[in-house]
Amino acid sequence: MTVSPVALRRKTECKPHPTARYWKKCDVEALFGLPFLELVHQAAEVHRQNFNPREIQLSTLLSIKTGGCPEDCAYCPQSAHHNTNLGKEQMMDVDEIVEKAKIAKSRGASRFCMGAAWRGPKPKDVETVSAIIKAVKGLGMETCGTFGMLEEGMAEDLKEAGLDYYNHNLDTDPDRYNDIIHTRRHEDRMDTLGKVRNAGLKVCCGGIVGMNETRAERAGLIASLANLDPQPESVPINRLVKVEGTPLADAEDLDWTEFVRTIAVARITMPQSYVRLSAGRSNMPEAMQAMCFMAGANSIFYGDKLLTTGNPDEDGDRILMEKLNLYPLQFELEGEVAEVEKASGIKVDY
C-alpha cells in the first residue's frame, strides 16, 4: 500500500487523540518510509499541538528486586536463563527505597518508577510494594511500578495504595513475540494491561528496538501500541542495551536515524502520550538525543542506572538540557524559575 506524504500529513494535522483510529501496520510502515526530515518535521508539529516542546518529564527508575527472573526474555540480563553474572538479590528495604526516592526528587525527578524481577508478584509481594508506594506518594511524587503479570484484584490493590502508572511493555511486534520470549505470550501481556485499565491505573507501555527486527516489525510494534484503547499515557522506547551472556549480545546495531524515526512515528500515532527515551540513551550522542526531542520525545529516565544497565549521569543531562533550553515538566515557568534551578540544577532561560 502506497500512502503519499500529503495524505499522511492530512491524517496527522490537528487531529484529536485518535481513540477511534485503527493504525494498520502498512500505514505505520508508510510513515517510517517518509523522507527523514519530513517525518521529523511532521512529528514536531504533532508534538507542538499537544505539548509544550520545552518541557521534559524527568523520571527515575529503581530496581527494588534484582535478578533471578524465571522469564527468558532474550534481551534481559536479569533472566535466570542467561549467564550474565548478575546475582539474585532480595527485595530492598522499604526505608532504603524511600531514601532513593527522596534523592531523586531533590535532583529534579517528578516520577519514581520501581521494577521487580518477577514473572508476577505474589499476594504478599503486593502488600510489600503497596507500603512502598504509599511512602513514595507521601513525598509528592508520581509513582510507577513494573512487577510483571498481575492476578485478579492486584491492580486494584496497587491503585488503592496510590500507584499512578503500571508499566507493562509489549516488547516487540506481536508477530515475532515468541522469537524473543518463550516463557509467556503476547496475549498474556494484553491480559495484564486489561486488568490495569479496568482498575483505573494509567498505562506505561512501550517496547525495545534494535533486536534484529525489520522496519516492518518496528512498525508492527508501534501499531500494536497505538491501537491500545485508550492509548498508553506513557510510551517508553528502548534501544537495546547488549549485555554479554544474553541471546542478543551480538545483535546488529540499529542505525541512529532508524531510532529517531521510531520516536517520530510513535509521536505521530500517539499524539497525547509521553514518549520516553529509555534504555540505550547512554550510547546516544547529544545531537541524536536532540533530534529525538525534536521528533517528539518528552520524557527521559534521569539517574545513572536503569535497573541493571547504565544511563547518562545527571550532570550530563543537566548540561544537555541547558544547551537545548529544556526544563523539567514538574514546574511551571511563571513564578517558579528559582525552584526549577534549585531542584534540578538546570538554568531556565525564557
Swiss-Prot record:
Give the protein's cofactors.
[4Fe-4S] cluster; [2Fe-2S] cluster
Summarize where [2Fe-2S] cluster binds, as residue positions: C113, C144, C204, R276
- Tell me where in this chain the Radical SAM core domain is found: 54-278
Q: How is the cofactor bound?
A: Binds 1 [4Fe-4S] cluster. The cluster is coordinated with 3 cysteines and an exchangeable S-adenosyl-L-methionine.
Q: Which CDD domains match?
A: Radical_SAM
Q: What does this protein do?
A: Catalyzes the conversion of dethiobiotin (DTB) to biotin by the insertion of a sulfur atom into dethiobiotin via a radical-based mechanism.
Please identify the protein, giving its name as recorded. Biotin synthase
Gene transcribed to yield this protein: bioB
